[in-house]
Amino acid sequence: MDKGEAEQIVSHQDLSEDYQKPLQTCKNKCFCKKCCYHCQLCFLQKGLGVTYHAPRTRRKKIRSLNLAPLQHQSISTKWGRDGQTTPTSQEKVETTAGSN
């Protein structure tokens, strides 16, 4: 066995050990070609766009100050419509009904 074959066997063993290790997270946010291909995890995430978890979305908080007065009002006043008719509208209805 010469020196070249021994180095090749050692490098082969190093590579097989590297594949047995779990993938380590990379803190690099760069998407250049060098950074995308420097490790298997970066290639999957940056180069191919594969993610194994969905990004967390934040829900918008509802302001409790605006909802507190609305909860104590009736439904008809919340939307700006009165459920009861006013005396002037009743008079208009009577006059239009009487003219027909």
Swiss-Prot record:
Chief location bin: host cell
Pfam families: Tat
Cysteine-rich, as annotated region: 26-42
Keywords: Activator, Host nucleus, Host-virus interaction, RNA-binding, Transcription, Transcription regulation
GO cellular component: host cell nucleolus
Sequence motif Nuclear localization signal, and RNA-binding (TAR), location on chain: 54-60
Region (Core): 43-53
Subcellular location: Host nucleus, Host nucleolus
GO terms assigned for molecular function: RNA binding; RNA-binding transcription regulator activity
Transmembrane segments: none
Ranges for region Disordered: 76-100
Example GO BP: positive regulation of viral transcription
Function (record text): Transcriptional activator that increases RNA Pol II processivity, thereby increasing the level of full-length viral transcripts. Recognizes a hairpin structure at the 5'-LTR of the nascent viral mRNAs referred to as the transactivation responsive RNA element (TAR) and recruits the cyclin T1-CDK9 complex (P-TEFb complex) that will in turn hyperphosphorylate the RNA polymerase II to allow efficient elongation. The CDK9 component of P-TEFb and other Tat-activated kinases hyperphosphorylate the C-terminus of RNA Pol II that becomes stabilized and much more processive. Extracellular circulating Tat can be endocytosed by surrounding uninfected cells via the binding to several surface receptors. Endosomal low pH allows Tat to cross the endosome membrane to enter the cytosol and eventually further translocate into the nucleus, thereby inducing severe cell dysfunctions ranging from cell activation to cell death. Through.
Entry's family note: Belongs to the lentiviruses Tat family.
Subunit structure: Interacts with host CCNT1. Associates with the P-TEFb complex composed at least of Tat, P-TEFb (CDK9 and CCNT1), TAR RNA, RNA Pol II. Interacts with CCNT2; the resulting complex is unable to bind to TAR RNA.
Protein name as annotated: Protein Tat
Organism, scientific name: Simian immunodeficiency virus agm.vervet (isolate AGM TYO-1)
Upper taxonomic lineage: Viruses, Riboviria, Pararnavirae, Artverviricota, Revtraviricetes
